[in-house]
Amino acid sequence: MLTYLTAGESHGPQGTAIIEGIPAGLAIDVDQINADLASRQGGYGRGSRQQIEHDQVEILGGVRHGLTLGSPITLVVKNRDHAHWSSIMHPTSPATAENTLRKVERPRPGHADLVGGMKYRHRDLRNVLERSSARETAIRVAVGNVCKQLLAALGVTLVGYVQAIGPVDTDLTKPQTVSEIKDAITQNNLRILAQDRVAELHDLIDQTRRAGDTLGGWIRVVVNGMPAGIGSYVSWDTKLDGQLAAAVMGVNAMKGVSIGDGFEISRHPGSQGMDEISHDADGYHRLSNHLGGLEGGMTNGMPLIINAAMKPIPTLYKALKTVNVVTKEVEKASVERSDTTAIVPASIVIENVVAIELAKALTNSFNADNLARLQEQLAAYREELRGY
């Protein structure tokens, strides 16, 4: 079973991940991981921290001479900014007046600060925000890219892109293939399909930054190449759409997830929302894809369409009212270094967490000790589906 765990704080020395369940014999391209890490740091509307960090992955275990061993894989992404926080974030030295200078007592509305402090009895809310920070998604992207490389070896490709920023819809075209989407979104720094809206959105982001405010948006992930029948209908926790939804909602700032036409499908009669079935020499197909490639908790062979709604970043330079957890006085919330919008990097993160769930689903469906064996079994299964 494919599992992973991450550890580390935003201004600690590094983010660390251990992945278990990647088959032996998978060629790992470190450059691909680093390319995704760089993409996560990019995009219009990012804050100043991205000028400090230059994320690169280090592989400390589970890979030898470029090939996975089948044993747990350890990944590390260093935090360069830790050099400025080493005493404040020191794991063993006692707290002093000097290293408590960045103590946080004024929780930010919309963040984990207050409720996390209440739950774990922290009076210095930095103990909460350091882990709840989206900085954790850097190491999660590294995990996801390993899974994307596994998926590619199994004939599965995917891409995440930005559908909307604030009130502006940027997805004005019909669904496209993964390769077509990639070609389009790499032509701008917003990962959007509508090239004619780039300048408008730059202006919107600039105006929002000057106002001390932030923006959210919508993200879409498209997946090509998943065979039918991955996932299950027999138990609630084996439904692939439920697993994908949980993974998406586990990403910082996500407040909604849908599959295919999603919430919009509820507005239409069933005759306009289902995907009619056809058959040819290659097997069964759907004449449309309103359901986003998932029926009954299982893939149906059509492209997967996963949508995610991201709230505006709650760290505001135009700080909102809050209550000091020590004095109980009404004050302005703490202000941490932040972005105006993180919708672009979030699309990379969502792409990668979807990849993790799909890799889990495929390795759970077949013998995944060795890549070649997994490929043989998947090829035989695809052939079986064609003959059904």
From Swiss-Prot:
Cofactor(s) essential for the protein: FMNH2
GO MF entry, a single one: chorismate synthase activity
Keyword NADP: yes
EC number: 4.2.3.5
Cofactor, free-text remark: Reduced FMN (FMNH(2)).
Superkingdom as given in the UniProt entry: Bacteria
Catalysed reactions, semicolon-separated: 5-O-(1-carboxyvinyl)-3-phosphoshikimate = chorismate + phosphate
EC supergroup of this enzyme: lyase
Gene Ontology BP annotations: amino acid biosynthetic process; aromatic amino acid family biosynthetic process; chorismate biosynthetic process
Residues reported to bind NADP(+): 40, 46
Annotated residues for binding of FMN: 131-133, 252-253, 296, 311-315, 337
Keywords: Amino-acid biosynthesis, Aromatic amino acid biosynthesis, FAD, Flavoprotein, FMN, Lyase, NADP
Stored Pfam families: Chorismate_synt (PF01264)
GO cellular component: cytosol
Pathway note: Metabolic intermediate biosynthesis; chorismate biosynthesis; chorismate from D-erythrose 4-phosphate and phosphoenolpyruvate: step 7/7
Family, similarity comment: Belongs to the chorismate synthase family.
PANTHER family hit by this protein: CHORISMATE SYNTHASE
Functional description taken from the UniProt entry: This reaction introduces a second double bond into the aromatic ring system.
HAMAP family with a match to the protein in the record: Chorismate_synth
Quaternary structure and partners: Homotetramer.
UniProt protein name: Chorismate synthase
Species assigned in the record: Limosilactobacillus fermentum (strain NBRC 3956 / LMG 18251) (Lactobacillus fermentum)
